[in-house]
Regions:
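N-terminal signal peptide c-region/cleavage motif recognized by signal peptidases
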Residues: 21-22
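Early extracytoplasmic/lumenal segment of secretory-pathway proteins
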Residues: 27-92
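Periplasmic-binding protein-like
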Residues: 207-216, 222, 260-281
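Paired acidic/hydrophobic, glycine-rich loop segments that form the ligand-binding mouth/hinge
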Residues: 79-84, 222, 239-244
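Conserved C-terminal helix/tail region of periplasmic/extracytoplasmic solute-binding proteins
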Residues: 231, 339-370
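Mature extracytoplasmic/periplasmic domains
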Residues: 278, 283-344
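A ligand-binding cleft/hinge motif common to bilobed small-molecule-binding domains
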Residues: 88-91, 240-260
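Extracytoplasmic ligand-binding site segments that recognize negatively charged/polar headgroups
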Residues: 89, 93-220, 227, 232-234
Length: 370
């Protein structure tokens, strides 16, 4: 064999080995598919997880429980971890959508607060199907200066009257009003405000006074959306919104960082409000369950979840993480409500299919104003 032939053969073998190695590495690349809410994780969480484990994360986002539920009910989502709210997880687990959580694969499960687990168990019995991620209250976000200008210094900013009393909302219309596009939560808030059971199983409660009030308010509501209000509050494009605690506090922080003179505040109304947890769960048809458990155990580390809470302004269920929270988060009553406020919070039970259909039809009428 000539020197040239040897050189050619060596090059051919080297190239083939490199191709095989590259193919092997590609085959060994582990992947995890996550479907989470928008604006709901720290900027470095996923990159740090990949750096530590070598697992590539494909991360998609949604902004309503209804969107997530539609995908889950259709089946074959392709996701290994999803994040329903606890009241939706209850219904979905009854439908056989999730795998039970194998706690033996989660050494860091011990970090969870027993009191928080007890709260979650109202929807996820025996804490069987979900891992609590962040605690959410549904309250009111408002532009301090614009609301004061519209309603005066005695504006009822600590009450549902601010946004559910038609004469107040009419005065706020010009500076912009938004509601969550979350029918079950809005109806629960309105029913509670009207002195009715927020978990009512009577269809007339949804088609009667609650619906009448929402239709009366409708002309003053600019839009229904479950994420747009964050930036709109921060930019001063709207002045009041029914929204989620951490989202509104993120808006306040964005305005502060932008130094745009917009002062946003969050209130849990004195009459009481809904509280629940968003939960990580593993769909029954998940293909990468080992990777899912690695990610869940990673999230249960105090340093990891504290970093997330410090960025998204939501309370977590990890007792060991509390000392690592920033004072801005830990001492904020809108994030970690004091005992007297917690006493007035209520959870939401799973809606029956019949009530769910009534709510969907009624909500469509409200959104269209008909």
């Amino acid at each position: 064999m000539t020197a040239l032939s040897k050189k050619w053969l060596t090059g051919l073998i080297t190239g083939a080995l490199m191709a095989v190695s590259a193919g092997t590495l590609a085959a060994e690349q582990k992947t995890l598919h996550i479907y989470n809410w928008s604006d709901y994780i720290a900027p470095d969480t996923l990159a740090n997880f990949t750096k530590e484990t070598g697992i590539k994360v494909v991360y998609d986002v949604f902004d309503s429980n209804e969107v997530l539920e539609g995908k889950l009910m259709a089946g074959s989502t392709g996701y290994d971890l999803v994040v329903p709210s606890s009241q939706f997880l209850e219904r979905q687990s009854q439908a056989g959508i999730f795998q039970p959580i194998d706690k033996s694969k989660l050494p860091n499960y011990k970090n969870l607060d027993p009191e928080m687990l007890k709260l979650v168990a109202q929807n996820d019995h025996d804490n069987k199907y979900g891992i609590p991620y962040m605690m959410v209250t549904t309250g009111i976000g408002y532009n301090v200066d614009k609301v004061k200008a519209a309603l005066g210094k005695d504006a009822p900013v600590n009450s549902w009257d601010l946004i559910l009393k038609s004469e107040n909302l009419e005065k706020l219309k010009s500076c912009g009003v938004s509601f969550l596009d979350a029918p079950s939560e809005i109806y629960a808030a309105v029913l509670h405000y009207l002195g009715k059971d927020p978990n009512s199983s009577d269809p007339k409660d949804y088609t009667g006074a609650a619906n009448d009030l929402l239709l009366k308010l409708r002309p003053s509501i600019r839009y229904f959306h479950s994420s747009q209000y964050i930036n709109d509050l921060a930019n001063g494009d709207i002045c009041v919104s029914i929204g989620w605690s951490g989202d509104i506090l993120q808006a306040a922080n964005r305005a502060k960082e932008a130094k745009n003179g917009v002062n946003i505040a969050y209130t849990i109304p004195k009459e009481g409000a809904m509280v629940y947890f968003d939960m990580f769960a593993i769909p029954k048809d998940a293909k990468n369950t080992d990777e899912a458990y690695q990610f869940l155990n990673y999230l249960l580390r105090p340093d990891v979840v504290a970093n997330i809470s410090n960025h998204v302004y939501y309370a977590n269920a990890n007792k060991a993480a509390t000392p690592l929270l920033s004072a801005e988060v830990r001492d904020n009553p809108g994030i970690y409500p004091p005992a007297d406020v917690r006493a007035k919070l209520f959870t939401q039970s799973v809606l029956s299919p019949k009530i769910d259909r009534v709510v969907t039809r009624s909500w469509t009428k409200v959104k269209t104003g008909k």
